[in-house]
Amino acid sequence: MRHSLPASIVHALLLAAALAVGTPAHAQTDALPSWNDGPAKQAIVAFVKDTTEQGSAKFVPPEERIATFDQDGTLWVEKPMYSQVMYCFDRVGALAEKKPELKNVEPFKTVLSGNREAIAKLGMRDLEKILAATLTGMSVDEFQAQVTKWLESAKAPRYDRPYTELTYQPMQEVLSYLRANGYKTYIVTGGGQDFVRVYSERVYGIPPEQVVGSAGGTKYGYDKSGKPFLTKEPKLLLNDDHAGKPEGIHLMIGRRPHAAFGNSAGDQQMLEYTKAGDGARLAMLVLHDDATREYAYGPAQGLPDSKVGTFPQALYDEAKKQGWTVISMKDDWKRIFAWE
């Protein structure tokens, strides 16, 4: 026995099906559920809609859809110290086991002491010595294995969680949202390119070839069996910070981004470079103003000053002047981490 549905229900089902078919990814569901509905979220949604809808005056061809993201402080926690620096400090202990004489040599002696106040007072030359000793002198494969092993056990002191669990859920949603709408996402970081490439695909869905960072030289050679390998050398090829970011983008990507995201003075030139292009451009800065859920630092807007991820008032003023969007962690993000 056949039963017919009421005409009103049939009409509703047909309408729903018609709306679902061919609907752009940005219009089907809320792709940014961890964002409060405010100017920042609206700016992202409007940008994606304007640049991906056929017939839009601001339409961007798929091959030109490039979005760049700083990592530390933009995609994951950078306090109390950059994760790569924490890795280097931890590696000093392993080095001292192989070379006991380092226990009496500065700055390694200070790091091994565990005295946080003394470590915080180390100068740039001291840090350079530590970075050179822990990031170079081994093969690329050995370095990748060391970083992978460290990430398996290292935890951020405040949260007692692995660093890879301290990515910002709202920014993860932006990455996915952009990719769903044809954007290619890149990490452009002042941190070590080889370091970030170890985990970028697993943590952010960004393959290693789409990571641009501060890069050191390598030397080609052969092991005892004749197998070729690369050795990391203490020679800086690219300082991917401040003006180095647009230089790195040109060198490694070859296209000017249509969207750029950062959080500090080191990202200013990347945002300037992005906005200077023709057509629709999106420039956004994350402001850390939530001491309860994460950290609060600036010193923009009267927030505490910080040597890590400095966001000066001059950058805040420039953002307002240039029409960049400042993302307030406190006001714009419903939650910060996926595990909240």
Where are these regions (language model features)?
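Bacterial N-terminal signal peptides that target proteins for export
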Residues: M1-L13
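Bacterial N-terminal signal peptides
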Residues: V10-G22
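A metal-dependent, Asp-based hydrolase signature
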Residues: Q28, M81, M86-E165, Q169
